UniProtKB/Swiss-Prot annotation:
This is Omega/M-ectatotoxin-Et1a subunit A. The keyword Ligase does not apply. It is found in: Secreted; Target cell membrane. It comes from Ectatomma tuberculatum (Selva ant). Algogenic for animals, human and insects. At high concentrations (0.5-1 uM), it acts as a pore-forming protein that forms nonselective cation channels both in cell and artificial membranes. It is weakly selective for cation over anions channel conductance is identical in both directions. At lower concentrations (1-10 nM), this heterodimer inhibits cardiac L-type calcium currents in isolated rat cardiac ventricular myocytes.
Length: 37
């Protein structure tokens, strides 16, 4: 499913720093979605 942009805007400040330190599918997905904002 698609996560609404409003949710990404809320969670990116929290999860993006984590994602940048990690690798793997989930971290890559987070970095890609947060990068679109």
């Amino acid at each position: 499913g698609v996560i609404p942009k409003k949710i990404w805007e809320t969670v990116c400040p929290t999860v993006e720093p984590w994602a940048k330190k990690c690798s793997g599918d989930i971290a890559t997905y987070i970095k890609r979605e947060c990068g679109k904002l």
